[in-house]
């Protein structure tokens, strides 16, 4: 297969290339003692999660999508570039936490590794027991930690590639993740986009050192129109900073800042609303009537911020369409809440009117099908333990333009 062209200007243009992360050893680091800290609601059966993810990737390939695996991209970047290796090691080894003697010894060891084992440690972490050198008599940190404690924290949320980067037009945005357990993820995506041969000419639309914003909060409603959820993860400052960056680079003319609840069940905008067609969204019924948006528009020398309006009205106006269709799932409040928690509204569009969804959300999927949307179901008994659906697990890198 030839390399698919890169760039996205919508949520629903035919998908050509996507970045996924096959779950691996980092999920095996989860225990009842750390899963909350690492943002997982349970302990996934890793082998089954891998089977489910393989089926997801195979489905995309069967539809002509080029699947790029994050672990492969990371290994290839580390293999090609000494600067990439130094960048990854520097981000992983925290001298403030480990102390100078241990940090220096660990960094020296990591520099000796080939690309594949180094990539594994950068993703799956390392415990004190796994250190390949003896106890350093100068390191109080080494002496006072339990052997099972992490000297490098694992990154189980790499599974959700949507959040650490997203594409808009021909550019990529490296996000600024707000939760401590995820901050280092952006160092890996930044490394990949900076050093992998596939992305060397790609320019940036946002940088990780900017105000907090996460890809799950960003919806490309139409060419030039971007919705940004503001809640638990993305801040108002992040939404405003993204808007100004997109305006400066002529990547958008309108950004809709959408307030959402600051709670885990609605951590990102895409947990309650995703696009399923050029003029249609599926939305959590319990917030449909209350969801609002602050339109931010470019003007000479700055921006204008309008008063909040109903989201569906503000979106339709910005998109230049008469009405934004909201798929009426017709669910009672209890069923709606259950299926929202299981990522029923978190769909991945492969083309206009064609989406991937978790099979367990039978009621939502049935309503989508009744509305003319082709639903491609995938299993999710284990993938869902981190609270993310098909959209969360995918970073589209190439779509046909609308």
Curated annotation (Swiss-Prot):
Compartments where found: Cytoplasm
GO CC annotation terms, alphabetical: cytoplasm
Main location: cytoplasm
Reactions performed catalytically: L-arginine + H2O = L-citrulline + NH4(+)
Gene name linked to the record: arcA
Matching InterPro entries: Arg_deiminase (IPR003876)
UniProt entry tagged with the keyword Hydrolase: yes
Name the record gives this protein: Arginine deiminase
EC number(s) per entry: 3.5.3.6
Keywords (A to Z) from UniProt: Arginine metabolism, Cytoplasm, Hydrolase
Catalytic site positions: 392 (amidino-cysteine intermediate)
Biological processes annotated in GO: arginine catabolic process to ornithine; arginine deiminase pathway
Classification of source organism: Bacteria, Bacillati, Actinomycetota, Actinomycetes, Mycobacteriales
EC category name: hydrolase
One Gene Ontology molecular-function label: arginine deiminase activity
UniProt pathway: Amino-acid degradation; L-arginine degradation via ADI pathway; carbamoyl phosphate from L-arginine: step 1/2
One Pfam family in the UniProt entry: ADI
């Amino acid at each position: 297969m030839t390399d698919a062209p890169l760039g996205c200007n919508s949520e629903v243009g035919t998908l050509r290339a996507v970045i996924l992360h096959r779950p691996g050893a980092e999920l095996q680091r989860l225990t009842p003692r750390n899963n909350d800290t690492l943002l997982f609601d349970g302990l996934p059966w890793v082998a089954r999660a891998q089977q489910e993810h393989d089926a997801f990737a195979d489905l995309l390939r069967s539809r002509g999508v080029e699947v790029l695996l994050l672990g492969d991209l990371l290994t290839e970047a580390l293999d090609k570039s000494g600067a990439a290796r130094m960048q990854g090691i520097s981000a992983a080894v925290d001298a403030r936490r480990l102390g100078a003697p241990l940090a220096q010894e660990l960094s020296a060891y990591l520099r000796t590794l080939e690309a594949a084992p180094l990539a594994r440690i950068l993703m799956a972490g390392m415990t004190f027991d796994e250190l390949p050198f003896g106890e350093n008599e100068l390191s109080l940190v080494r002496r006072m930690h339990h052997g099972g404690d992490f000297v490098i924290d694992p990154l189980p949320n790499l599974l959700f590639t949507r959040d650490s980067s997203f594409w808009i037009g021909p550019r990529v945005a490296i996000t600024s993740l707000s939760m401590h357990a995820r901050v280092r993820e952006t160092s890996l995506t930044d490394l990949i986009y900076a050093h992998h041969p596939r992305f060397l000419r790609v320019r940036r639309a946002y940088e990780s050192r900017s105000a907090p914003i996460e890809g799950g909060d960003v919806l490309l409603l139409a060419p030039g129109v971007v919705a940004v959820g503001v809640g638990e993860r993305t801040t108002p400052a992040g939404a405003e900073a993204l808007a100004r960056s997109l305006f400066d680079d002529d990547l958008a003319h309108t950004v809709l800042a959408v307030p959402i609840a600051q709670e885990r069940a609605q951590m990102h905008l895409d947990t309650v609303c995703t696009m399923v067609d050029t003029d249609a969204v599926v939305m959590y019924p319990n917030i449909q009537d209350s969801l609002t948006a602050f339109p931010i528009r470019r003007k000479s020398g700055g921006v204008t911020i309008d008063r909040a309006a109903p989201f569906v009205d503000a979106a339709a106006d910005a998109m230049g369409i008469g009405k934004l269709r909201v798929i009426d799932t017709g669910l009672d409040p209890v069923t709606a809440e259950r299926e929202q928690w299981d990522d029923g509204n978190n769909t991945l569009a492969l083309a206009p009117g064609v989406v991937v969804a978790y099979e367990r959300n039978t009621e939502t999927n049935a309503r989508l099908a009744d509305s003319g949307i082709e639903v491609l179901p995938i299993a999710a008994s284990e993938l869902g333990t981190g609270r993310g659906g098909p959209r969360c697990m995918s970073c589209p890198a190439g779509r046909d333009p609308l």
